[in-house]
């Protein structure tokens, strides 16, 4: 033990906290746990070789065999749970929940950006959650920032004519305001926004059906009138 000024530390296990100089309020339990820590404080390392390699990091919580092993010498505020979780991680403010040393854990998080990934570390900017693969849910509530298209039923709504719709489809191969297959494949869709766009088309279609029904009724009345004469 090379402690020269560190206080309120608990080191249990051969070589645990061996290099500590001035680090304080650390709890290292297990063979070689936190053995290279010198100035890092307020860390909890539980498990054989947990936190080995970290020298100055603070506020880390590691639980499991070789958690945080060979991670950044100054990595701080990391939470690693599971066998070899966070192995070789060079950053700070990270969450790893995993049972091996893979670089892409089952659950990954970044406390600095409030992001969480399942089987992925690639979380797009502006999003808090990402999943690599399919998900099954029983219910999803989507909040919309854009307006819901009830305005289609306003008397001043400029409803395109059927001929205009036909012309647009002939020229572009898709409905107006609806992304193309290529755009969806490249960028994906925002579910709430797409639901609103599809509802708009359904409401427009409803207006066309109402108009068509009125024309049919007019024709039927004309036919019936001629028949009775």
Where do the PLM segments sit?
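C-terminal intramolecular chaperone/autoprocessing and neck/assembly modules of extracellular spikes
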Residues: 109-195, 215-229
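Glycine- and small/polar-enriched repetitive beta-structure motifs of secreted/surface proteins
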Residues: 1-126
């Amino acid at each position: 033990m090379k402690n020269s000024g560190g206080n309120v530390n608990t080191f249990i296990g051969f070589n645990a906290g061996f290099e500590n100089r001035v680090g304080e309020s650390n709890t290292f339990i297990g063979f070689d746990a936190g053995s290279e820590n010198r100035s890092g404080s307020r860390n909890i390392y539980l498990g054989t070789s947990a936190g080995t390699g970290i020298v100055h990091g603070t506020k880390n919580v590691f639980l499991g065999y070789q958690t945080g092993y060979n991670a950044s010498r100054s990595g701080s505020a990391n939470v690693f749970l599971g066998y070899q979780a966070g192995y070789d991680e060079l950053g700070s403010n990270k969450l790893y929940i995993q049972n091996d040393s893979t670089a892409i854990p089952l659950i990954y998080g970044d406390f600095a950006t409030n992001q969480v990934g399942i089987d992925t570390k690639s979380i797009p900017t502006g999003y808090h959650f990402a999943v690599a693969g399919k998900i099954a849910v029983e219910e999803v509530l989507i909040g919309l920032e854009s307006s819901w298209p009830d305005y289609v039923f306003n008397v001043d709504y400029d409803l395109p004519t059927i001929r205009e719709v036909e012309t647009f489809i002939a020229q572009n191969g898709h409905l107006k305001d609806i992304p193309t297959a290529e755009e969806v494949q490249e960028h994906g869709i925002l579910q709430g926004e797409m639901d609103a766009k599809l509802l708009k088309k359904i409401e427009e279609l409803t207006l066309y059906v109402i108009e068509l029904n009125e024309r049919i009724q007019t024709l039927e009345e004309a036919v019936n009138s001629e028949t009775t004469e």
